[in-house]
Amino acid sequence: MPKHGKKYTEMSKKIDKQARYDFNEALELSLASSYVKFDETVDIAVRLGVDPRHADQMVRGTVALPNGLGKEVKVLVFAKGEKEKEALDAGADFIADEETVAKIKDGWFGFDKAIATPDMMGTVGKLGRVLGPRGLMPNAKTGTVTFDVAKAVEELKAGKIDFRVEKAGIIHVPVGKVSFGPEKLVENVKAFINMIIALKPASSKGTYLKTITVSTTMGPGVKIDPMFTK
């Protein structure tokens, strides 16, 4: 395991590793432990009491963060005809024409999210091997396969995120930037946690929210007491 630098070690001393904090305390500590010059992303990792190997315990969904992500989200749309104009008017950065599709096949990924109208899924399917591993494959379950492309583009631009529990039972997502300050970050974190709770599988037994940890890109993790979500 690589050793952390002096600054990381110094900041870690501010945090009681055995303690479980409420939302406000956790975010304030996390921001106070930021020691780099750039505007770090704030992430949250939630370990759930589920077994993702079972389909009825898969936790997956989307949530619109009240204060967005604090970064520009570049959106690519697979559409044709009037839906192209609708997507561009809503703020889409790219329309996947034949030239763009060829660029993607050659390894171009200058976008963060992809949306497709249902009638374009034949084209999208041919790119599954390159889009899928990067989490860029449009999916009806996350609202990115739809004829309402304007709404989908606007939501992604505003900070809508999609998430899915990993094999280890952990969901890890960004919830904003250090520059947001504690108040806006708390609002984003609560919106995300409330959605996770709402998606609790009926087959999940025992403790559902096992651990919740927030951290900045380079900073140490701060644990939130799951009891504060009730």
From Swiss-Prot:
Pfam families according to UniProt: Ribosomal_L1
Subunit (UniProt): Part of the 50S ribosomal subunit.
Organism: Desulforapulum autotrophicum (strain ATCC 43914 / DSM 3382 / VKM B-1955 / HRM2)
Top-level division of the source organism's lineage: Bacteria
Cellular component aspect of the GO annotation: large ribosomal subunit
Function (record text): Binds directly to 23S rRNA. The L1 stalk is quite mobile in the ribosome, and is involved in E site tRNA release. Protein L1 is also a translational repressor protein, it controls the translation of the L11 operon by binding to its mRNA.
Gene: rplA
Assigned keywords, A-Z: Repressor, Ribonucleoprotein, Ribosomal protein, RNA-binding, rRNA-binding, Translation regulation, tRNA-binding
Family to which the UniProt record says this protein belongs: Belongs to the universal ribosomal protein uL1 family.
The protein's name: Large ribosomal subunit protein uL1
HAMAP family listed in its UniProt record: Ribosomal_uL1_B
A GO BP annotation: regulation of translation
Molecular function GO terms recorded: rRNA binding; structural constituent of ribosome; tRNA binding
